[in-house]
């Protein structure tokens, strides 16, 4: 009996180890995407690049909530550099670091900061939330801000300890996360005070590090502008390199009006401050909590949404952080925003199509490529075509196109449309069609037969497959690709 029990235990342990070490499973949705290429000659596939500390980047990925153990770095870290991002967002976790007054335990955070650097990714850090050893303001997303006094004094000591420990390692500090979350919409004056005091403490220790304000989630500009005015009244705009916002909108293109108006308003108060899209993403299932809940998402829609969102905000010139590396276990739900699908133990099950989509964007849209509004399209197809021009070294090299008038659907079918592209003079060059979801690169040579330049700096394409997901029309010279 004992021998049988021991044998079963040994087999069970062996099976567990084998399961923990085996590679992630293939993804049914990804295989289906790859089986439905655009109806154009396939010539290759985007060549993905791993993260590299020496290479500047527009792109970041979220490694949040590990301060509350909703995810575990060791279980997914190997996949972070495969995304090709330049940066990763961490949360500092005051409550996890200082569980006894005045005693800081940084080992857990060291593993994340140093681990990312070893993987070729620059960490940036959101300083948050409250700490129950000092108050009941909360240590999670709904944490309340605190005024000057003993709690603030303890916070400032903690901030200085963090800045000292990670000087030269963390590239930017973000002060708090979503202070305007839910019922805290009248806390902008408290936030302005917290930001200025925190920013001064950081710069006292690390004069060179970047500082980011707000991490706002409110769809209204009022909170941001009220907080910024409060920061300005306290002489704090000099510390504000970036203002971050979290753009969770069902139709990503709907944010454009909001962000452009916010830029104009900020230019009158904080003209030297840039905007940063600091956290957003789409769920992979219909969720009953958190952002974008109540919509029938799936992994096709998720990947399309994230691609559209990345191009929308990059198209306005804003750096972008995608939420998030892995599914998060909140206890009361598994949040499905992850590039990696995980089980209840937080172990990777498979890489979602969203993972590959992010790889494709970081590979093609490098730091030396910039958005330009010099390109636009004309079409009578009956759909709103969103267009973002691509520029390198002052030269227009292509554009991204997609249907941007609705929430993305689950279909893998494209619509053949006729359109005119203004602002590109590339018809005699070797243009290719890059599917940003699959990473497939297709030839466009046959698409131009019988059609020349309609006028200087413009050309027409009689039949181009488009859908509700970005494709890029680009000179082949600028496309890193592996040949088919």
Protein language model regions, located:
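Noncatalytic carbohydrate-binding groove/subsite architecture in carbohydrate-active enzymes
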Residues: 188-312, 316-320
């Amino acid at each position: 009996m004992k021998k049988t029990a021991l044998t079963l235990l040994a087999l069970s342990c062996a099976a567990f180890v084998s399961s923990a070490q085996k590679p992630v499973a293939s993804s049914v949705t990804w295989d289906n995407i790859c089986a439905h290429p655009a109806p154009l000659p396939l010539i290759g596939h985007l060549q993905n690049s791993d993260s590299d500390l020496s290479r500047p980047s527009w792109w970041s990925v979220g490694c949040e909530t590990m301060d509350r153990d909703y995810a575990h770095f060791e279980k997914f870290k190997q996949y972070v550099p495969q995304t090709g991002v330049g940066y990763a967002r961490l949360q500092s976790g005051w409550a996890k670091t200082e569980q006894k007054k005045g005693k800081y335990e940084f080992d857990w955070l060291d593993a994340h900061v140093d681990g990312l650097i070893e993987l070729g990714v620059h960490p940036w850090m959101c300083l948050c939330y409250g700490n129950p050893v000092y108050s009941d303001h909360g240590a999670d997303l709904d944490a309340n801000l605190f005024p000057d006094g003993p709690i603030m004094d303890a916070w400032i000591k903690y901030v200085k300890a963090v800045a000292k420990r990670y000087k030269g390692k963390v590239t930017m500090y973000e002060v708090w996360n979503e202070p305007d979350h839910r019922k805290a919409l009248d806390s902008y004056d408290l936030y302005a005070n917290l930001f200025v005091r925190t920013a001064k403490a950081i710069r006292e220790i690390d004069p060179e590090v970047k500082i980011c304000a707000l991490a706002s989630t409110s769809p209204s500009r009022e909170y941001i502008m009220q907080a910024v005015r409060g920061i300005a009244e306290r002489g704090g705009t000099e510390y504000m390199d970036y203002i971050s916002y979290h753009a969770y909108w069902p139709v990503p293109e709907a944010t454009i009006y909001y962000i452009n108006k916010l830029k104009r308003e900020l230019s009158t108060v904080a003209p030297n401050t840039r905007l940063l899209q600091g956290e957003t993403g789409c769920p992979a299932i219909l969720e009953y909590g958190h952002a974008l809940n109540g919509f029938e998402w799936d992994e096709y829609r998720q990947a399309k949404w994230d691609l559209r969102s990345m191009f929308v905000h990059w198209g306005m010139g804003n750096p972008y952080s995608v939420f998030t590396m892995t599914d998060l276990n909140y206890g009361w739900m598994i949040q499905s925003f992850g590039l990696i699908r995980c089980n209840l133990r937080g172990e990777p099950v498979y890489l979602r199509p969203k993972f590959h989509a992010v790889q494709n964007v970081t590979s093609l849209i490098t730091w030396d490529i910039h958005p330009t509004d010099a390109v636009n399209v004309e079409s009578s197809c009956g759909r709103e075509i969103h267009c973002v021009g691509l520029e390198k070294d002052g030269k227009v090299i292509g554009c991204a196109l997609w249907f941007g008038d609705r929430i993305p659907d689950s279909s893998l079918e494209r619509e053949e449309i006729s359109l005119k592209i203004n602002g590109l003079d590339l018809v005699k060059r070797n243009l290719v069609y890059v599917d940003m979801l699959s990473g497939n690169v297709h030839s466009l040579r046959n698409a131009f037969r019988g059609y020349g330049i309609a006028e200087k700096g413009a050309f027409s394409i009689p039949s181009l497959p488009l859908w509700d997901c970005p494709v890029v029309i680009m000179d082949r010279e600028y496309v890193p690709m592996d040949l088919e």
